[in-house]
Amino acid sequence: MANHAKLVDQEIYRSPVDDFELNYQEYLNDDDDDKQEAPVAVSKAPKGKGSNHGLGCRMKGLFDGFGGTDLKTIMRHLRRRRPKSGQALTNFMLSGNMEKVVDQHVKDFVHHFGRINPENGRIMGALRGNDFFNFGGLHNNLGNTGKVYLDNLMKGKCGKKRKVHKFKPIVVEELDFGAPKPAVPATPKAPVAPVAPVIPAPAVTPQKPKVDEPTYADSVSDFGLDFETEREKCLRNKTLFEDPEFPATAASLYYRTPPRDRIIWKRPGEIIANPQLITQGESRFDVKQGALGDCWFLAALANITLYDALFYRIVPPNQSFTENYAGIFHFQFWHYGKWVDVVVDDRLPTVNNQLYYLHSADNTEFWSALVEKAYAKLHGGYENLDGGTTAEALEDFTGGLTEYFDLRKSEKAAVLAALVKGMEMGSLFGCSIDADANIKEAQLRNGLVCGHAYSITAIHSITYYGEDTTLLRLRNPWGNEKEWNGAWSDGSSEWSKIDEATKKQIDVQFARDGEFWMSFEDFFSNFTQMEVCNLTAEIFDEIAEMTGVNRATETVEEEHQWHEIMEDGEWSSKKGTAGGCNNNPSTYPKNPQFSTFFTAPQSSIEADGNVTVIVAVLQKYRRELRSKGKDVLPIGVSIYSLGAEGTARSPLTAQFFSQNRPIARTTVFVNTREVTVRFRVPPGQYVIVPCTFDAYDDAEFLLRVYANGTLKSSLL
């Protein structure tokens, strides 16, 4: 059984966004925010005028626009927003919704194809690379969204909204918490004829690599690999690409625990006669878990397949096993604040001629296995993907910002509001059930699996015995029969009371495929954590550039959109910036301090004069450092108000911190890649202080601030 995120064992899901641990009703009934002492030592001070923070604030902020804070009000809103067709509420970017808009654009000749064949998606004038290598292969079955994006890409119309950098693997041995040092430049070896390297069956005791054994980064160009250049070189020489940065060797598979089976690296054309990158369009059923404990990654990837425009940002459509095939592919990920293009060859780990890790339900399709390989390269090896959170992968796939919800501490109506509002705004959702530290991914009697990552793909209000019932559709990335078996599960008695037309409208399918429906009540009672990935206006702008579809013109009403700023920073004991939390009052002021000022349009200011803000701190390179025995640190963040007239041009002092409480903060320091704080305050100037729990812990981090307004920031 696959091992779920080790980070779960370390209480990664203890919500870092809960400022003071109040439930929502306590917040409504009592203005005293000091119900429970935070683990951070701070002096008590009066609550800032006009400011809201804590769990109560977060819950209250979610109800904006619903007209009420009770469950029935939220359900009425869901019924009003239900599409006229009767389909479940998802969001306009979901594959079916986006495809309908693009289909109409193609039908109305809004988009004029110039560089690809609109019938089959073939690139005009492309070389059939498979003719060289006798690997077979068929054309990709791109939908119209993929075809329009590919045509725009070939015309040079895409890429203005998002700068993508060539990926340069870091040398972990030289990582010194400053800017990561690139590998020593070297000339990559010329590609040679394809082979299938064999890794002998490992010994019982893992073998450590020799001290003088070169790492995969030793042969990396200082500038990284360029996909077009490398592919053209291979086509010209009639050779298949072999990645010098991520070779088909044991070093790419593991650093500590070798696979149990004898691994043979094979190209798709050596596994099956007619491989395809994508068959019949990408689908959430294309993602099935293999021998690696990366269900967190699979859950996010399955979620992304629901959004054509987001999917093709990760999997550029200008590659296939037919046109210009040369054994080389590339994929794009958000990586610590910037987008990178990761180039890989198509040699994949196999056992008995079957893919060993992630694979598609269709054995002729290979996009998901290749994405996993590129993601493994991004983080230094396949074993580095063992254990994580869906939130982490969702951010790397979208560039969005993810929040955690501890469902045990959240109001039911607020969680439903988050689901409805999030679906309307294009947010992505994941969820899980806390697992016992000694039992990995145990299946409960109701069919759900503890410590396992699920994705939430739809929400729908249905009439059952005259009463409104809210249903959620969930997806288990294992893609098998391990599904919910309670009310509204596949083939349950509840569905017999629903007419066939309604079931067809909301796409109800009874199959052992890992997808199932359940009531919101059962979801709230059984799941303990939920993750929401928020997307910015810039992401939607790029999607409009890719597809010609403007979100604002397709939604029922203009929704508020997030705007973002990012700042790089580091906690360095060498530079005197690793001050630790406020339990260390003498060193705490040494932490990096960021002055943030934001203004907001009138439409973003809510009735009480406040604006919703999300602050996130993400620590870098910790997954890559696992091979050196280092993992994520417990981190937190505090936000301080300078008042209506206050300004800051230099770092705040120990005296300031002793006399002022933060207006928002993380009270639980969590050993996770990223922590977030959501709060509501008037527009103005605030100082953000990210920190580790212990002083003198070294790490680099990325600070992000989301708000419905104009943002400015600087390091004090």
Swiss-Prot record:
Top-level division of the source organism's lineage: Eukaryota
MF term (GO), any: calcium-dependent cysteine-type endopeptidase activity
Catalytic residues in the record: 295, 452, 476
Enzyme class: hydrolase
Enzyme Commission no: 3.4.22.-
Keywords tagged on the record: Hydrolase, Protease, Thiol protease
SMART domains: calpain_III, CysPc
PANTHER family for the chain: CALPAIN (PTHR10183), CALPAIN CATALYTIC DOMAIN-CONTAINING PROTEIN (PTHR10183:SF262)
Annotated function: Calcium-regulated non-lysosomal thiol-protease which catalyzes limited proteolysis of substrates. Promotes starvation-induced muscle atrophy.
Protein name (Swiss-Prot/TrEMBL): Calpain clp-4
Gene transcribed to yield this protein: clp-4
